[in-house]
Amino acid sequence: MDKKEIFQSVTSMEEQLSHLYRQLVQLKEHVVQLLEENHHLQIENDHLRRRLEQVTSELAEEKQKEKDHKHGHERKLVDIGEGYDNLARLYQEGFHICHVHYGSVRKEGDCLFCLSFLNKK
């Protein structure tokens, strides 16, 4: 190899290193964006879980008040039926009963679709 070929080889490696460095910088920026987005989504998820718990407890309290009110006036409760009882039991055992995830195991707490189905009259 003569000096010119060595110089061209070094110049080529320098360009390749420069290109790899630019790619590394872009990748680093993308990772930062993903980490920020993940953090924001975790915060939003926590807020939604708290709101779901709040709404669920409010609905339970409201339902209890309504039930107490009906018993106070000696009204007969409508017999919901065996099918509803079976679905409620499945839900309590940890399975989805909603049309979206029917039959799959609930992994993270309550499901809004299932709860809305159970709260229908």
Swiss-Prot record:
Cofactor, free-text remark: Binds 1 zinc ion per subunit.
Keyword Zinc part of the UniProt annotation: yes
Record's keyword terms, sorted: Cytoplasm, DNA replication, DNA replication inhibitor, Metal-binding, Zinc
GO cellular component terms listed in the entry, alphabetical order: nucleoid
Chief localisation class: cytoplasm
Location of this chain's protein in the cell: Cytoplasm, Nucleoid
GO BP: DNA replication
Pfam family, one: YabA
Cofactor(s) the protein requires to work: Zn(2+)
Family affiliation: Belongs to the YabA family.
Function: Involved in control of chromosome replication initiation. Inhibits the cooperative binding of DnaA to the oriC region, thus negatively regulating initiation of chromosome replication. Inhibits the ability of DnaA-ATP to form a helix on DNA; does not disassemble preformed DnaA-DNA helices. Decreases the residence time of DnaA on the chromosome at its binding sites (oriC, replication forks and promoter-binding sites). Tethers DnaA to the replication machinery via the DNA polymerase beta sliding clamp subunit (dnaN).
Protein name according to UniProt: Replication initiation control protein YabA
